[in-house]
């Protein structure tokens, strides 16, 4: 039963991804902002910052910071405005901390800032990548480097996995699986470039550069996966939420995507010369 639930959710996710990534623009920006806020809520709950299921003023300031950063990046696509939004969020959180002292402890302040920064800053890179030149194609590399990597790593690990990658944190993951995930992502990325980017740009070199970008993204995606797992282990929870049947929460499904998105964005800018 769980298999079919997970499969059904996966199909729905793929369909929604197709709709929103093809749409791009304000639609995708709004979706990224919604994902950021949902993931923020999941992290706040996981880290036990909220009390009695109610948001405090401190957490509300973190949420406002996410909205401010998302709006700044959508409207300007300028990292200077983004940095300004992050600074304002920090100042707002500290303002609440100082003028409500000793209601909040320092570790609560740092946790709120972390929970807001993690999804709030990383999710918008999906939107920013979509807005690059060739962005309607490049944005898919984020998911090739995360979800394809995850699938290839799982299949490779099942077939030949012997050496543990992170035995304490994730006993089922193997070094062989991790390598298989990277290789699989590189191959799928190369195929994707051959089918879409070479006809679009006329450059045969795209196949090699995109394979490299996909491989780099796949390496980082596995760090993202393990990072989210570490937080769950620290707080003794199985899943971040139940919003996606069979998968858990937004953080459970997008943990690797969050780390991959900025890597794909910056490598696309640096190696491919993509611009807004």
Regions found by a protein language model. Give the residues of each.
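Membrane-embedded alpha-helical bundles of polytopic integral membrane proteins
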Residues: 1-215
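Transmembrane alpha-helical segments of integral membrane proteins
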Residues: 95, 194, 223-239
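Hydrophobic transmembrane alpha-helices of multi-pass small-molecule transporters
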Residues: 185-186, 253, 260, 269
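Hydrophobic alpha-helical transmembrane segments that constitute the membrane-spanning cores
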Residues: 188, 192, 263-268
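Hydrophobic transmembrane alpha-helical segments of multi-pass transport and channel proteins
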Residues: 215-223, 250-258
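Interfacial loop-to-transmembrane junctions
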Residues: 233-256
């Amino acid at each position: 039963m769980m298999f079919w639930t997970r499969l059904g959710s996966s199909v729905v996710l793929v369909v929604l991804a197709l709709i929103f990534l093809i749409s791009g623009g304000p639609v995708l920006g709004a979706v990224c902002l919604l994902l950021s806020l949902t993931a923020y809520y999941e992290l706040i709950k996981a880290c036990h910052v909220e009390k009695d299921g109610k948001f405090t003023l401190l957490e509300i300031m973190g949420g406002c910071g996410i909205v401010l950063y998302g709006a700044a990046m959508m409207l300007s696509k300028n990292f200077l405005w983004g940095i300004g939004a992050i600074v304002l969020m920090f100042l707002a959180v500290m303002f609440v901390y100082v003028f409500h002292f000793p209601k909040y402890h320092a570790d609560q302040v740092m946790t709120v800032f972390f929970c807001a920064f993690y999804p709030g800053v990383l999710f918008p890179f999906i939107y920013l990548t979509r807005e690059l030149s060739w962005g309607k194609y490049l944005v898919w590399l984020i998911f090739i480097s995360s979800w394809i990597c995850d699938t290839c790593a799982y299949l490779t690990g099942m077939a030949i996995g012997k050496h543990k990658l992170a035995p304490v944190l994730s006993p089922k993951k193997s070094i062989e699986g991790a390598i298989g995930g990277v290789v699989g992502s590189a191959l799928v990325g190369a195929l994707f470039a051959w089918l879409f980017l070479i006809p679009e740009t006329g450059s045969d070199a795209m196949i090699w550069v995109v394979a490299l970008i996909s491989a780099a993204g796949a390496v980082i995606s596995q760090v993202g996966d393990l990072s989210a797992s570490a937080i769950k282990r620290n707080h003794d929870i199985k899943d971040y939420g139940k919003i996606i049947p069979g998968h858990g929460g937004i953080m459970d499904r997008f943990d690797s995507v969050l780390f991959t998105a900025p890597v794909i964005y910056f490598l696309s800018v640096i190696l491919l010369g993509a611009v807004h």
